[in-house]
Amino acid sequence: MTVKERITALRARMKETGIDAYLIPTDDFHGSEYVGEYFKCRKYITGFTGSAGTAVIMQDMAGLWTDGRYFIQAADQLEGTGITLFKMGEPEVPTVHEFLKKNLTQGRCLGFDGRTVSAKEAAELEKMLDENGVSLSVDHDLAGDIWENRPALSCEPVTELDIKWAGESRADKCARIRKAMEKKGADLFVLTSLDDIAWLLNIRGGDIHCCPVVLSYLVMTKTEIRLFANEKAFQPDVLEALEKDGVTLFPYDSIYEYVKTFKKDKKVLLCKKKVNSRLVSNIPADTRILDEENLTLLPKATKNPVEVENERIAHIRDGVAVTKFIYWLKKNVGRIPITELSAAEKLYEFRSEQENFIDNSFDPIIAYGKHAAIVHYFATPETDIPLEPSGFLLADTGGHYKEGTTDITRTIVTGPTSEEEKKYFTAVLRGTLNLGAARFLHGCTGVNLDILARQPLWEMGEDFKHGTGHGVGYLLNVHEGPNSFRWKTVPGGNAVLEEGMITSDEPGYYREDGFGIRHENLMVCKKAEKTEYGQFMCFEFLTMVPFDLDGVVPELMSVRERNLLNDYHAQVYEKISPYLNEEEKEWLKDATRAI
């Protein structure tokens, strides 16, 4: 079926079930940013493939809301579908909730699958729409009803993460969380975020593409841990090890019945921003719910010394692969046929040669020329274009290694570029260097520091429509909270930067139909000196790959900025050159020369 045919079929099901507007978020049953094929209902209905977006279907309109990363991509993919694009955050553009409040009147009904909407959002919708006399219907997966040949739920094999990689045993992690439960006065802890469960139990899977997680729910009490997952994914030795640490396996969907048995005298801790609304609504009304952040959130984000040291190793391995790729690319572009897709395959080949490489940490963004202006562009056979010996290639890629997860962006000069392009290339690089060199008092958040990355562009009256940085998991999700860099404050999204947190530093500049630039390093937060003013903090770059000096205008940089770049490049040469052949090493020596 075409997108138009799918929407027509969905509207027919809406009529049958008395639903006037149907909400389709991106989420799976666990609030994941990236989801497995089974859960891609929004993509199936709208044809939009971006990782963030919400669709609303009514009888007389269809709309898709997405953020600035995807404006260009969404406009292209929605063309001819009859779906209206709502550019989130733009002036005069209503939010999804504002739109629903305005367009749903007395007696109307909003529907959604309650497993794909958080309890927090569902409560907000119910309160807002109740004022209009609008009802909710949350038990129907209407998109699933019309989805022909829907993929099955993933059930990839589960493995254990050895303590030499994790740095802390499963038993010790569970004991830590139980202590936190005790402090909060909680009798039960309901955990549904897939990366949190994988971190807590030191298990990894493959149920989401490029995200080594296991489709599961978890309930911890003072005496037991119930894991709800597909038993077929667990080998006997993994099950035995889990059982030894007090973890008992139950069928994946059975949690919805289990939570109905919670006693009224028990206090249940869960995060309504993360747990889906159907699960929370199944908990008896007289049970007291403590709505708190997941107790695993900060422990997961603050990497322990073993994890940090392993990440340094992972980034050297990754640095070797990406450096070899850049050398190969600059040597061969214009000489042999290279396209965006074939370049991505070549980079994967270089990564695969590295010890302990597992997989990409996300689908590679290899974007040449005007494609680089699409912040999260993914080449397909239909969009793939050849690389030419001119302009920029933006390569935003990453890998999973046993030692950790990487995420790196380099804007590579493939040939002659204009002075204007170099001006912006240099401005963005200055932002990356300045943020990475920050020293700050403990207690600062990413909001406090974000201006260091944006200032060079802001001075030019320019900006970029995405966050400056995100947390990164340890052999887990490449996007992880709560740490981030952004200039706007958001409720509950302004976490203090703690020792051991790994965060990306990735300002950019994008000119539609022109070019795109992004420079990204991962960095770990560390303690610096302690004075009478308090504990100072700093960052250490983990990523070890040269920035392309062919795009840099040294005269546009301060002496301090040039020194920062030179010092970084000296580190890159020292750590990466021992793993290169003589030709590559000679090239890297020039690529990291002092300016």
Question: Which sequence ranges carry the predicted segments?
Answer:
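Active-site neighborhoods and metal-handling regions in enzymes and metal-associated proteins
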Residues: M1-I595
